[in-house]
Amino acid sequence: MMYHIPGVLSPKDVARFREQLEQAEWVDGRVTTGAQGAQVKNNQQVDTRSALYAALQNEVLNAVNQHALFFAAALPRTLSTPLFNRYQNNETYGFHVDGAVRSHPQNGWMRTDLSATLFLSDPQSYDGGELVVNDTFGQHRVKLPAGDLVLYPSSSLHCVTPVTRGVRVASFMWIQSMIRDDKKRAMLFELDTNIQSLKSRHGESEEILSLLNLYHNLLREWSEI
């Protein structure tokens, strides 16, 4: 399943990010990809050795960790270190699949269950640059408002189309979920969102408490901690 997570960063935060990223040191984006991805990748990334990078990636981690909808959809166990990329002048990233595992500074290795892109450029400011994701439900083309995030299975083939005007800047990361199976995770998300909707409309009740108990028992049964 693919999820649109709105408002991860406020407009004020997005403007500050963009201003700071204009001063960043950018390097060839192929430094962080494997042999297969390097053949189709043509973009730039912020140098991960810079002090600015360290500060901004911490802010992204804090923002997603505090976003209730992100947590409900991803049920994260481990988040990768966020990276930042830039596309301009017809730069693109052809169809590829993300690696199944990635190194992690604290945990050694993590499994990539979900991929996330946090858009930092207004969609009207550039042409092209759609994230195209192929999954079992077909092909999806994604170009979200700045500050919004898209979450999708890392097992999906995906690409970024050429940016023919303007500049597309984004942050991206990977998530190891407490729930490895996409279908089970989707069922838990649907159950959770419906419980929250019922609570907002009708308040607390024995039936809602029973559904909440079911949710946590399923999470207990399926989670890998």
UniProtKB/Swiss-Prot annotation:
- The source's domain of life comes to Bacteria
> Which keywords fit this entry according to its UniProt record?
Dioxygenase, Iron, Metal-binding, Oxidoreductase, Vitamin C
Organism of origin is Escherichia fergusonii (strain ATCC 35469 / DSM 13698 / CCUG 18766 / IAM 14443 / JCM 21226 / LMG 7866 / NBRC 102419 / NCTC 12128 / CDC 0568-73)
Q: Which PANTHER family match?
A: PKHD-TYPE HYDROXYLASE YBIX (PTHR41536:SF1)
Summarize where Fe cation binds, as residue positions.
96, 98, 158
Q: What class of enzyme is it?
A: oxidoreductase
Any idea which GO molecular function terms this record carries?
2-oxoglutarate-dependent dioxygenase activity; iron ion binding; L-ascorbic acid binding
Q: Which cofactor does it need?
A: Fe(2+); L-ascorbate
Annotated cofactor note? Binds 1 Fe(2+) ion per subunit.
Q: What protein name does the entry list? A: PKHD-type hydroxylase YbiX
Q: Identify the InterPro entries for this entry.
A: Oxoglu/Fe-dep_dioxygenase_dom (IPR005123), PKHD_C (IPR041097), PKHD_hydroxylase (IPR023550), Pro_4_hyd_alph (IPR006620), Pro_4_hyd_alph_FE2OG_OXY (IPR044862)
A single GO BP annotation from the record?
A: DNA damage response
